[in-house]
Amino acid sequence: MPHFPPTPLTLHIATNADTLATWLIPAIAPVIKSHLVEINLLIEGEARTINRLKDGQAFGAISVQATPIKGCQLTRLGCVDYLLVASAEFSRHYFPNGICADSLKKAPGIAFDHKDNMHTRYIQQHFGLAQGECPLHAVRSSDAFVTMAKHGAAYCLVPKTQIKPELASGELVHICKEHIITETLYWHHWMLLKGVYKDVSDAIIAHAQAVLD
């Protein structure tokens, strides 16, 4: 039987929504089950999670930042491929002749929030459209991205691992196969972790390195 302290310990972890929707919970679930802890997940864009670690709100952060911050360590977790997807119906309606700059000016996309620049960077880099030239919903949920796309309400960038069943069934289609975004994730955390902090950190690293490329 696990030995529990008299009161739960709160662990604050900064993560992006895509990681939360895919592999983070399976990674930390064994530690949650074997220790009396309360997990507080601080959701930010993958480029901004590191700020929660810098200001002391979290003991660890999953981030795309490849350089360590003062007083912390980092470990490479792996790579995530992002695909631009939509429902077949949406694709036929907005992109009957393929995706292009003119069609993107009418087709609604999705971003996490107004600070999330992954979608706008992708559209600008590959189609030459600046921020504000395309309609864009703000939805702070990776699962809701997929739901909106499946209902034909928008197109979006999502991790390939999150939508394997939908791609296999044809419920979602990859609408821009020539351009894939690959993001490398890193785990930043306090130095010299002990106890359950180290257990959570080790679990995140081991699971991520097993499931990510």
Q: What role is predicted for each listed range?
A:
Residues 22-23, 52, 118-122, 165-166:
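Phosphate- and divalent-cation-binding pockets in alpha/beta enzyme and binding domains
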Residues 6-70:
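Central regulatory/effector-binding core of bacterial HTH transcription factors
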Residues 74-81, 85-153, 168-179, 209-213:
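C-terminal regulatory
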Residues 45-46, 63-68, 87-88, 141, ...:
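Beta->alpha turn/N-cap motifs
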Residues 48-50, 144-146, 163:
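Short, hydrophobic alpha-helical packing/hinge segments within bilobed ligand-binding/sensory domains
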Residues 23, 175-213:
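A late-sequence structural motif
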Residues 59-63, 154-158, 175:
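Paired acidic/hydrophobic, glycine-rich loop segments that form the ligand-binding mouth/hinge
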Residues 2-11, 102-106:
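Immediate post-signal peptide segment of exported/extracytoplasmic ligand-binding proteins
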